Amino acid sequence: MNLEHIVELRVRYDECDPMGFAHHANYMKYFEIARTDLYRARGGSYRDFEASGLFVVVANIQCRYHMPARYDDLLKIAVKIDRITEAKIEQSYIVLREDTKIASGEATLAVVDRDGKLQRIPDILRDPLEGP
C-alpha cells in the first residue's frame, strides 16, 4: 500500500515557544491534521464514522525531530498509509519546509466502540483508505 496525502500549513505564533520554534507537542496535531484530511480527501467523513458509534484512536505514535520549524514557516505534512490489517492502520509522516526534513514519525491507529472495546476496522473506514 502506498497511498500518500500532503497538507500544507503555516506555523502560527501561538504554536511557538519563547525561542520562536514550533513547540514539540504541535507535531502530533500536525500529524492529526494530515491524517483526517487524507480521509476527507478520499471521500470519508469522521463525523459520519463516529455517528455510527465507532472511533479511531491512536494506539502508538512516535515523532523524531530533525530541525526546528519556526513561526510563519510553510510546512508540508505528508501522511502515508503503510499497512492496514483487520485491527489496525499503520501510517508514517514526514514534515518538510521546502526540501528540508523537519520531523518524521509513525502512528498505529485502532478502532474502538463507545465502551473502548477494540473493533475490527469496518469497510466505511477501510474502503476510502484502500481504494485507487
Where are these regions (language model features)?
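Hot-dog-fold acyl-thioester-processing enzymes
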Residues: N2-V58, R114-P132
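Generic structural detector for well-ordered beta-strands
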Residues: E8-R12, R64, T108
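Exposed loop/turn and edge beta-strand positions of beta-sandwich/beta-sheet ligand-binding modules
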Residues: S52, A59, L75, I89
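HotDog/MaoC-like acyl-thioester-processing domains
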Residues: L3-V7, R40, R70-L74, D82-P132
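Short glycine/proline-centered loop/turn elements that form peptide/ligand docking sites
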Residues: G43-S45, V57-H66, K80-A87
